[in-house]
C-alpha cells in the first residue's frame, strides 16, 4: 500500500533558522498513548494539540491528503473519494478509516514530531498560499469574484510573463508548485494530480472565468531534483523560483503579506549537470558530454558558410570554428555535430527548416533558442590574445547573453578554455568514419560496449575520460607528438611498480571530477560539501608530492634519471604538477573549513558554521553577528530569572533553546499571568512565552537570518578567491587528465600480443604482421589474424574480393582501427607493424538512404564517394566497400571501374585504398599500384544441394575470388533448400545467356578508356552523372 511522505501530513510553519534534534518527550508519550488506544479516532485538532500550533493550514492538509489518494488510485480510489468529500464538506477530522488503511501512520507521527523538533529553514509565514480557503476541487465562482487573482497567482503571472519559454517551479512552503499551462505539462509527465483552475494567463480558455485561481500541481521539496531530471530529459527549460526572505526578516521589514520570490536557477538538459546538487558518487552525469552552440549560417546556391562557438559547461571547453560546406553534402557540419554533440543551438534569428533538419536528423533532442547580442566589453578584454574574427565575437556575445540566464558565463572569461576545432597536429574523422568504424558506439545497440572507446578506456577520472574521448576522436598527425605518447606509455609500463606511481594512480582512481567541480565553483552553483571535497582532493595530491619529494626531485633534476631519458611528455607533466602543488595555497583554504559543518546534512548548520573561524582570515563580520546573537541569548537568560520569580520555581528552565518555551502542567496553568502567550499544549502540559520572551525570540530569529545572509556572502567571497586561481588550477587538472589518459593507453598496450608500431614519414606505408581487429578480439571471439601490406612501391590499392560474410568488411575496418590506434599513440594488436602517418581516413561502408533530403540509397552513395574523391590527399586512407551496389550491375561495374582508373591516373599522388568488390572483372585492371586479394575459403558440396557450400577461413590471400557464394549466405539465413536450388537454376540459365556473355565486350570498352588515361575531366563527368540522378 502506498505510504505518503511526512510532508504530506504536517508541515511546520515555525520560522526557524536553527536545528535542534532533541525529541519532545511529552509529545512522544502522547502519541504512544494514542497508539495504545488503537490508533483510531484521532482527529486533526488532537494532532495539533500534540504537535503544537505549527502545523500547516487545514486546507493544505486536506489538499495533500486528496493528492495522496489520487497517486494511489489503483488500490483505494473509492475510499479516497469518500474521504475527500468529507474533507471538503466538514473538514473537521482526519478519518479513522484512512488511518486504518495506513498501518505505519503512528510511526509517521513520531517521525513528524522529530522533524518538528529539528526545526526548518523553510518559512511558511502568512502567504495566501498557506492560508488558502479554496476547496481542493476548485468551486465555480461568479464573474465578479474571479476578476482579481490571489496574491500568489498574481506573483506567478508576473514572473511567467517574463519567462514564457520556461516552466516555473515555485516554492510554496514545503512544496514546489506549478501553475496554469505549466501545471498541465508537468502533471502529464510526472503523472501527478492536477487541481482545476484557470489554464491561461489571459483567460483565453472559456472555462477560466469559472475560477479565481490558476490550476496547479505540486511536488514535495525533498523530491525536487528527481522530478527536475525527468522534466529536462523531455527537453523542457525549468526555472526554480525560491522565497528570498524569511519570516523574521519579513516581519522586521514590515513588508506585505506575500513572500518575495525570484528565480534562483534555470535548468535545461545541457545545464542541469553543471547546476544540480553535487553528488560525487555519480559516474555519468546528465549533460556531461553535450554542448551549447551559438551559430550563424550564410548560404549561396551551392555552398554554406558556417561560424560557430561551442561550449561544454562541465569541462569548460570552448571550441570556435569557421568553415564552408557543400549545401548538398553537409559533411563538415555533420562532422562537428558528431564531435561536439550539441543539444542546444542558439541563434539571433530563427534557423530555416532545412538547416534544422540537418541537426535533428542526427539528434532529435536538439533544442533551438534565440538570443540577442549584448555588449560585454570585459569579456573581450579578457580574451585579447585570441584570434577571433568579428563574426565569432558577435556569436560570443550572443552566447554570453544566453548563458547569463543560467549564470554560467564565467567559463567564457578564461582564454585557456578556448581552442580551434581544426589544428595542424591532428586529423578530423568524418561522421561516416566514426560511425562505420564504431569509434564511440557499436552499430547494433548504439552503446559504448563493442566500440574502440570501450576497448581503450581505462581512465580513472571523469576529466581523464573526457580527454581520452577527444584523443580518440582526433588522432595525431604530428610524428613527434605520437612518439612522445609512445615513449610515455613505455615509461609507465616500466615504472608501474614504483611506490610513487602506484600511490599516484590509486589517488587518481578515488578522485572526484575536479574539472566539473572547478567550473561549478566558477559558476557559483556549487555546494559547500563539494568545495570541501575539491580542496581536500587538491590538498591530498599536494601531500603525496610532498611526501615523495626525494623521488620526484631525483626524477626531475638528475641527468641520468629514467624519466628524463625515457619520456619528455611524462617529465613535463610531473614537473608542472610538482611546481603547482609546491606553490599553491589551496591546502590553506581547506584549513579554513569546519569539516563537520561542511558534511552536515543540516542545511542551516552547513551554512552558518562552514568556516573554521580560528583559521578563516576574514572572520570579523561573522564574529560580530555571533556576538549580537549571544547578547540576545543573554537577555533571554535574564528573562528566565524573572519567570522563575513569577512562577516561584527556582529550578525552571526553558523547554529548549530553539523555541524558548516555558512549560507548565495543566493543573498549574491558572498561576500563569494572563498576558503570557500560550503556544501549544498536550494533555499534560501547556507551553507559554512571556511578552518579553516573544519579543526576544523574534529578535533572535532576525539576527540568525542576518547571520545566514552574511555567511552566504562570505562563502561567495571564498569561492571567488578560488576562481582567481582558475587558470593555474585548470592547467593542473589538464596535466592530471593527460597523465590519466597515458595510464589508460598503457593499460590497453599491456594486453597480450600488443606491439609498439614503428613510424615513418618517408613514404606511404602500412605494413602489419598478424594484425587483429581490437574490438572483435576484445569480445572474446577467436579472431583470425591477417597481414597488411600497402606501400607507395606496390599495392597502394588493394582490391579485395571473396565470399559474402567471408570477413572482407571486418578486415578493412581492422586496418583503419590499427592506423587510428597508432596515431593516438597506443600499441596495437599485432606481431609487428610499420606505418606512415595518414592525414585523413574516409569510409564508404554500408548503404542507407536519406529520405529527409529526398536522396535515394544510390544518390547518397555517389555523393559520399564524390566527397571522398574531392577531399582525399596522397596521405589519406580510403575504405570503399562495394561501390556501385545501389544500382544495376552494368552501371555499378562501370562506376567502380572509372573510380579505380581515376586512382591509377593519380599515380604517385594516389592515396592508400582498400576497395571491396564483387565485380571480379575489376581485378583485370593492369597497374603496379593495384594488388588483388581475397578472403580464403574451402568449397564443399552437400547431398541434395545444387550449389557449392563454402567454409570461411577468414584469411587474406593473394589473388581474386571468382564467386561470391551468395547461395551459401542464403543457406546460413535458413532459407529453404528448395528455394535456393531453384534460384541456382535460374542463375545458371542467366549466365549462359547472351546478355551476360557481353561482359567481355564491356571489359574491352573499359580497357580502351584505361588506355586513354582517365583524367580529372572524367571525374567531372562522374560528378555530373551523380547530380542528374
From Swiss-Prot:
Biased composition, class Acidic residues, residue ranges: 55-67
Subcellular location: Nucleus
Keyword hit for Membrane: no
Keyword DNA-binding (UniProt): yes
PROSITE patterns referenced in this protein's UniProt entry, alphabetically: DNA_MISMATCH_REPAIR_2
Chain positions covered by the region annotation Mispair-binding domain: 143-270
GO biological process, one term: mitotic recombination
Binding site for ATP: 802-809
Feature: compositional bias, Basic and acidic residues: 21-47, 97-110
Region annotation Disordered: where it falls in the sequence: 1-142
InterPro entries: DNA_mismatch_repair_MutS-lik_N (IPR007695), DNA_mismatch_repair_MutS/MSH (IPR017261), DNA_mismatch_repair_MutS_C (IPR000432), DNA_mismatch_repair_MutS_clamp (IPR007861), DNA_mismatch_repair_MutS_core (IPR007696), DNA_mismatch_repair_MutS_N (IPR016151), DNA_mismatch_repair_MutS_sf (IPR036187), MutS (IPR045076)
Signal peptide region: none
Listed Polar residues bias regions: 1-20, 86-95
Keywords: ATP-binding, DNA damage, DNA repair, DNA-binding, Nucleotide-binding, Nucleus
Any GO molecular function: ATP-dependent DNA damage sensor activity
GO CC annotation: nucleus
Oligomeric and partner information: Heterodimer consisting of MSH2-MSH3 (MutS beta). Forms a ternary complex with MutL alpha (MLH1-PMS1).
Function field: Component of the post-replicative DNA mismatch repair system (MMR). Heterodimerizes with MSH2 to form MutS beta, which binds to DNA mismatches thereby initiating DNA repair. MSH3 provides substrate-binding and substrate specificity to the complex. When bound, the MutS beta heterodimer bends the DNA helix and shields approximately 20 base pairs. Acts mainly to repair insertion-deletion loops (IDLs) from 2 to 13 nucleotides in size, but can also repair base-base and single insertion-deletion mismatches that occur during replication.
Family named by the database record: Belongs to the DNA mismatch repair MutS family. MSH3 subfamily.
Name this protein carries in UniProt: DNA mismatch repair protein MSH3
Originating organism: Kluyveromyces lactis (strain ATCC 8585 / CBS 2359 / DSM 70799 / NBRC 1267 / NRRL Y-1140 / WM37) (Yeast)
